[in-house]
Amino acid sequence: MSTIQRICLVLTIIGAINWGLIGFFQFDLVAAIFGGQGSALSRIIYGLVGIAGLINLGLLFKPNEERSREEAANPEMR
């Protein structure tokens, strides 16, 4: 996993935690920290989390490297 994918994964996790807080407690942590949902900084954070989610979408379609190595080493597993 590349560095950019790790950063995107962290941002996606932060976004998921924020959505959980909104769903369970009606508390938007990003808005509370950065000055409300309409502030420029909050919108930037929301945008970055959204882009990170799109980048992580590619992980769904990436083949498992460990499984590929096992299949290459042992062709009868297919």
Swiss-Prot record:
Chain ranges passing through the membrane: 7-27, 41-61
Annotated localization: Cell membrane
UniProt GO cellular component terms: plasma membrane
Membrane topology, as annotated: Multi-pass membrane protein
InterPro entries named in the record: DUF378
Coiled coil: none
Keywords, ordered alphabetically: Cell membrane, Membrane, Transmembrane, Transmembrane helix
Keyword Transmembrane: yes
Protein name stated in the entry: Uncharacterized membrane protein YuzA
UniProt source species: Bacillus subtilis (strain 168)
Gene name in the database record: yuzA
